[in-house]
Swiss-Prot record:
Pfam families: Velvet
InterPro entries in the cross-refs: Velvet, Velvet_dom, Velvet_dom_sf
Domain Velvet: 51-255
Originating species: Schizophyllum commune (strain H4-8 / FGSC 9210)
Gene Ontology terms: biological process: sporulation resulting in formation of a cellular spore
Stated induction or repression of this protein's expression: Expression is up-regulated during fruiting body formation.
Subcellular compartments: Nucleus
Name of the protein this chain belongs to: Probable velvet family sexual development regulator SCHCODRAFT_28806
Length: 278
């Protein structure tokens, strides 16, 4: 089992040249020149998967549905807590017509050592901005939601509050052990509709021909809404997955029944919102 680490920890150790330069070959490429490996089979030169070709995938198994706009005094995390599953595949004869892959049979705490998931926040376009005409040098979209394009330049990750880098927890999901990244304390500073992009990398593994740690997989989550305190509809009962995560040690609030905001709580929180905006 792994505890979630603070966001302040990772910017220090995510200096791939510092971590790996002693073992990287002299002709290895730095991150800005190396090919993108997201979602592709990766042959590892160093680390626990050295000599093997591995493909990683992420999928969101629990999406946030709603949240209250962050205030310094009254921070309420997204609900339910967003969670993504990591799947790993051994790849054989990569890059040939005989390429095949086989998912790992066992997932456990030891296998999860070194894996870290991080995320980014994107606002959903509203109204006419959803159908804007691209300019002659327009950037390509990174994702689409209901016909609306999402662009990297619109990323609003600095509006997130909480742990944006987490390590995996091993839980039973769909009848088998699974490595799950849980973002249990995220809040958003602004109201509106948003989605999350999840990305995973392995701190202890270095791809062949690379100097830097590589992002191995990514996925985009479902849209969710952030409400003002006045408009917040309340919290539904906790999901079965949330209860299972809490049972195995992830720090989460569990509710057997829904929780609606009372008038008294709304009035008190409104003053917090005003304090936060000052």
């Amino acid at each position: 089992m792994f505890s979630q680490l603070s966001t302040n920890f990772y910017p220090t150790i995510l200096q791939p040249q510092t971590v790996h330069r002693g073992t990287a070959p002299p002709n290895a490429l730095p991150a800005e020149r190396a090919p993108c490996l997201i979602g592709r089979p990766v042959h590892f030169a160093h680390g626990p998967f050295a000599g093997r070709t591995i493909r990683a995938s992420l999928d969101e198994i629990q999406a946030a549905q709603l949240g209250r706009k962050y205030a310094r005094v009254d921070r309420r995390p997204l609900d339910p807590p967003p969670a993504v599953r990591l799947r790993l595949f051994n790849v054989y004869n990569a890059g040939t017509e005989q390429q095949t892959e086989e998912e790992f049979e066992e997932y456990g705490d030891t296998l999860g050592l070194g894996f870290v998931c991080t995320l980014d926040l994107f606002p959903l376009p509203e109204g006419s901005s959803c159908h804007r005409s691209p300019g002659p040098y327009a950037e390509p979209p990174v994702h689409r939601v209901g016909g609306c394009a999402i662009y990297e330049s619109e990323k609003a990750t600095n509006a997130l509050v909480g742990s944006t880098f987490v390590q995996p927890t091993c839980v039973t999901f769909e009848g088998r052990s699974t490595l799950v990244f849980v973002f249990s304390d995220l809040a958003v500073k602004y109201e509106g509709e948003f989605l999350l992009r999840y990305r995973v990398f392995d701190l202890f593994s270095l791809p062949r021909g690379h100097r830097d740690i590589a992002i191995q997989a990514e996925c985009y989550g479902a849209a969710f809404r952030i409400y003002t305190t006045k408009d917040f509809p309340g919290l539904p009962p906790s999901t079965a997955l949330t209860k299972e995560l809490a049972r195995v040690g992830v720090r989460l609030s569990v509710r057997d029944t829904g929780k609606k905001a009372t008038t008294k709580r709304r009035k008190r929180s409104d003053s917090f919102d005003e304090d936060d905006s000052s």
